[in-house]
Amino acid sequence: MTAKPPFKVIIVGGSIAGLTLAHCLSKAGIDYIVLEKRKHIAPQEGASIGILPHGGRILEQLGLFYLVEEQIEPLHTAHQYFPDGFAHTTKAPQVIYERFGLPLAFLERRRMLRALYDTLPDSSQVLVNKAVTSVEREVSDLMRVTTYDGSVYRGNLVVGADGVHSRVRAEMWRLATSQSPGVFPEHEMSAMAVEYACIFGISSSVPKLQPGEQVASFNNGRSYLTFPGKNGRVFWFLLLKLDRKYSYSNAPRFSSTDAEKRAERFADDHIWAGVNFRDLWKSKEVFSFVNLEEYLFQQWHWERIVCIGDSMHKMTPNTGQGANCAIEDAAALVNRLHRALKATPDGSSLSSGDIDDLLGEFNRARSRRVREIYQGSRMVVRLQARQNLFLKLLGRYYLPYRGEVAADAASKIIAPAEHLDFLPLATRSATGWHQFKPGQSKTLLIPFLYPVVAFSLCVLAWIGNDYLRNGVVFA
């Protein structure tokens, strides 16, 4: 009797999510292949990523976090700067480091991708220049993926780790609409929106920005984030409020000329310690100008297809959570696959019902986990761009005087994170994982918002009276 072939996962996208998933599957002994549409696994696009303790813990379980540490200057200080010249400094990054035993890390995205690729046990399982054109159901337990060059790949599960412009997501919707109408609400398929855009890049020779000290410079309708790293390099973001809210399909596209015009317009914006945006721009090595899509999809799977990472939860970069949520997605999915396959007699096959149950539970758990992170990201990008009077007051007159509110809020997000439950945890894990109890993060905003609302009502009343008397205007 011929042995049944092993369970196989087709990963579409050689992204942080996709390559982390490949590592997790490898550790679990589950077969996979990665299809990446680009010609190179780690192109230089000027992008950088933050690895927070919950993402770092999973990478450490995989034996990879040392590669991150080799590339970074750990963050220990956070500065905030406001248009009226007010500055605020905290040690929140250092506090988080001490609570969780892992630093807040910032590095080039391409270096992270290269590290993930180079350390795979068998890099021949990652194929480049393989743009997916279709995903089809073949027989009861197999899916067929076809690429632009006509190649065909078969597996038991297709995972879309192909980013915000996901082809797998589109194929999942197409198949579901034709075979199971109503599974995906029509409004959700067009709900992703764009209100912000971002010019991001890497610069060198900005000596006044010190390694390990991140800066958030608040401004009206825009904000700046800078992360000085090793060897004098600075990773930076200029986040811009657009003129209106656009749907995903109708959002404007930007060229290098558009970026040059914005850079000239905002050249005199002060960032920190005598550094203006012109100083970053004139020493740039590489940059890009992109839209910042925002949306959290509710339905992540259909039959033997599931999407993870930015294809399901796209956030702005202000909180640094995008890559970490993608890493968590990968770990959470493999935890469930590993358990399910171990429970089968042959360890190699899962019925359609098994898959549906597994993916449904994964979807529910990850949606609950990501929801507050996504909402926090939406709030922070608008807070730092001072989008309205309430957020101006909150950022300038309330939060700087709330002690460790930033570190505490981050800690309650980090602590409940999922890790690989079939691998040992690192020995350097610190007390914060237990101190900030899992399951409590969903109550975080309640005690926070009561004093915020009370404070804002008082200040609004004062501003209204003072404005009527004296015509006071706030920067």
Curated annotation (Swiss-Prot):
Highest taxon of the lineage: Eukaryota
EC numbers: 1.-.-.-
Gene Ontology MF annotations: FAD binding; salicylate 1-monooxygenase activity
Keyword Flavoprotein among record annotations: yes
Residues annotated as transmembrane: 444-464
Family: Belongs to the paxM FAD-dependent monooxygenase family.
Role, per record: FAD-dependent monooxygenase spyC; part of the gene cluster that mediates the biosynthesis of meroterpenoids called sartorypyrones. Within the pathway, spyC catalyzes the epoxidation of geranylgeranyl-triacetate lactone at the terminal olein to yield epoxygeranylgeranyl-triacetate lactone. The biosynthesis of sartorypyrones begins with the production of triacetic acid lactone (TAL) by the NR-PKS spyA using one molecule of acetyl-CoA and two molecules of malonyl-CoA.
Name under which the protein is recorded: FAD-dependent monooxygenase spyC
Organism expressing this protein natively: Aspergillus fumigatus (strain ATCC MYA-4609 / CBS 101355 / FGSC A1100 / Af293)
